A protein has these predicted regions:
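Conserved ABC transporter NBD signature motif
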Residues: 25-33, 42
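Conserved switch/coupling elements of ABC/ABC-like ATPase nucleotide-binding domains
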Residues: 33, 178, 182-194
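Conserved catalytic motifs of ABC-family nucleotide-binding domains
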Residues: 124
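ABC ATPase nucleotide-binding domains
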Residues: 205-286, 304-306, 310-313, 329
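Catalytic Walker B motif of ABC-type/P-loop ATPase nucleotide-binding domains
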Residues: 128-132
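Helix-to-loop junction immediately C-terminal to a conserved catalytic motif
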Residues: 17
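Conserved ABC ATPase "signature" region
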Residues: 66, 81-100
Length: 329
């Protein structure tokens, strides 16, 4: 699930988890009404990891994960050797074995999030509900966390329903995307390739600044405005770091000549005052070369990110020569 803050993503998850009563309609799991599933039967079907902190006194991380087995233990809550094997496997899957004997209350937020996922996996549910599960994780554990979820959906047929703010992650990992808008209603539901278009994402989140690149799922900040001071000769991925450095410095720039399928093009389109772009696999027209020279003449200096130019890139090689002769390179 994706959508702006306050749209109702957490409300949907809490309704599915029976923490909130739906105002209308019926939630069904495998055709059975959620109202008819209670207690341990529900806990064996569904596990939940929400953003609210749990307060545990004098519990080790293993103790917390072991609570995921209680739907299977009966009235006395005694874990068998088989239960502990499930606990150990769940902790191994999310890489928290080394935290086994540590006090749960004293570990970091990121570690706590991983322990809570291990607890949910120890329940061996059919459905796993997650509310912004990667909020406290660094990039290493974020990738490992999502990889584990993906493996569980494939190998154990686990259904995962989660809210995510990282659009690039949602685009890469999800089979289906549910979009909840500012009107607290479902706006769209479908495959990521149908949802993640620049125009729709801007509308969904009410973006008035910056840009969304549908190819990478990444956001770009607003580019600097005003008279261009720098002309950048880029291409083949050599220009992106320069574009962003100029943006951070607040320096307006022009770039070209870029093919529209070049990896530099989306970043240039988002940040540059002007992009001189040519159609892919076509020879650059002479009028575009003249246009690039005119922009060069207006700029104070030229940055060339390229060292080598191929057969199809003679136009940019000529621009570098022109910049040198003009004393701007």
């Amino acid at each position: 699930m994706i959508g702006p803050n306050g749209a109702g993503k957490s409300t949907v998850l809490k309704s599915i988890a029976k923490q909130l009563s739906p105002l209308e309609g019926t939630i069904r799991i495998g055709g059975e009404s959620l109202d008819e599933i209670h207690g341990d039967a529900l806990a064996r079907k569904m596990a939940v990891v929400f953003t609210e902190r749990i307060h545990s006194e004098l519990m080790t991380c293993e103790d917390v994960v072991a609570t995921g087995r209680y739907p299977y233990t009966g009235k006395f809550g005694i874990l068998s050797k088989a239960d502990y094997r499930v606990v150990d496997e769940a902790m191994r899957l999310v890489h928290v074995e080394e935290l086994k004997g540590q006090n749960f209350a004293k570990i970091s937020d990121g570690q706590r999030q991983r322990v809570m996922l291990a607890r949910a996996l120890a329940q061996e549910p059919e459905i796993l509900l997650l509310d912004e599960p990667t909020s406290y994780l660094d990039v290493k554990y974020k990738l490992e966390f999502l990889t584990v979820l993906q493996e569980m959906t494939r190998k154990k047929k686990l259904t995962v329903i989660m809210s995510l703010h990282e659009l690039d992650m949602a685009q890469r990992i999800s089979d289906r995307i549910l979009c909840i808008g500012r009107s607290h209603c479902v706006e769209k539901f479908g495959r990521p390739e149908k949802i993640f278009t620049s125009g729709y994402i801007r509308r969904l989140f009410g973006m008035t600044a910056g840009n969304f690149d549908e190819g990478s799922g990444m956001m770009e900040l607003e580019g600097p405005k005003g008279r261009p001071e720098v002309f950048v000769i880029a291409g083949n991925g050599t220009g992106r770091h320069v574009f962003r450095k100029l943006q951070r410095s607040g320096i307006p720039f022009v770039t070209g000549i870029l093919y529209r399928n070049d990896i530099d093009y989306p970043t240039a389109e988002a940040l540059a005052v002007q992009v001189i772009a040519s159609e892919a696999f076509e020879e650059v027209p002479e009028e575009q070369i003249r246009e690039a020279r005119q922009w060069m003449d207006r700029c104070d200096r030229v940055i060339c990110c390229r060292e080598n130019f191929g057969t199809w890139d003679r136009a940019n090689a000529a621009l570098r020569t022109y910049a040198k002769e003009s004393g701007k390179l």
